Amino acid sequence: MKAPQIFNNAQICHMRERYAAQMGEVDFLHQLAVARLIERLDLIRRDFSHLIDVGAHNGFAAEALQGHEKVGTVLSLDPAPSCVAAASQYGEAHMMDVERLPDDLPKTDAVISLLYLHQVNDVPGLIQQMARQLRPDGLFFAILCGGRTLQELRASMTQAEEEIMGGVSPHIAPMADIKDVGGLLQRAGLAMPVADSELLTVTYSSVFRLMSELKLMGEGNALQGRRSSFTRRDVMMRTAEIYTQKYGTEDGQIPASFELISLTGWSPDASQPKALRPGSAKSSMTDLF
């Protein structure tokens, strides 16, 4: 069954291409995601001679992993030509379809994806493709935005449009809940799946500054059914008013929530620990007392 088409893939590519040169100006989320990746790698007692980065943006991960003692070469994949060109500064980089990996990819020790999967229509399908690229006992690691991301902006825009327009048009993408995405690793055949979530609060001078930075990140509105015209000025002004009234700080700033969900799994291998079968334990609780 075909996945629901929530996003316009052509618009996603257009936004990534248009703002590729400016992503580095507002890359704090990408840098945090890369830091979480490196923290995870540092805890793992093994090396990764080859790694594939899916949705690599400007090669943030490949740049950070240069010289890392546990990582060899990094292959960066992205659907935007300018992102591929930027990532190629740090190693091999190729084009990919928004939701499909190239057919001729080599098997690899690790597949990662940092802040990309939340823009994909068929998340289960892409995770399965990524899992198939792994060698036995290979690492899958991804970070995506979760459902609490931009919850303040979503609520403020919804209220403003209902008041002024009498209805709501799509502006902010629906994002996955951690309870939903954790099961996708098992569906992809990955062992020892783990899902973690952290909520980050970032302050901005205004709603308009927040929305400007979202565009520079390549995270603008790419939803199917979005209005082709610009959002009306009175709606935007009312959104800013509601946002400030409900969430604004004493010093005139506004907070914005970003939920980052981390997914970790491993391709199956005989060397991995396995849970005991029920009833196969060699001792009982009474032996402890």
Sequence positions of predicted segments:
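Class I SAM-dependent methyltransferase SAM/SAH-binding core
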Residues: 39-104, 110, 124-125
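Short catalytic micro-motifs in class I SAM-dependent methyltransferases
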Residues: 115-119
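A short glycine-rich, Lys/Arg-flanked "PGG" loop and its adjoining helix->strand segment in the class I
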Residues: 124-139
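A structural alpha-helix within SAM-dependent methyltransferase catalytic domains
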Residues: 38, 127-131, 154
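Class I SAM-dependent methyltransferase Rossmann-like catalytic core
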Residues: 1-49
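Conserved catalytic/acceptor-binding region of the Class I
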Residues: 141-209, 217-230
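Catalytic cores of nucleotide-enabled group-transfer and carboxylate-activating enzymes in metabolic
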Residues: 91, 99-101, 105, 130, ...
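C-terminal lobe and adjacent flexible extensions of AdoMet/dcAdoMet transferase-like proteins
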Residues: 188, 208-289
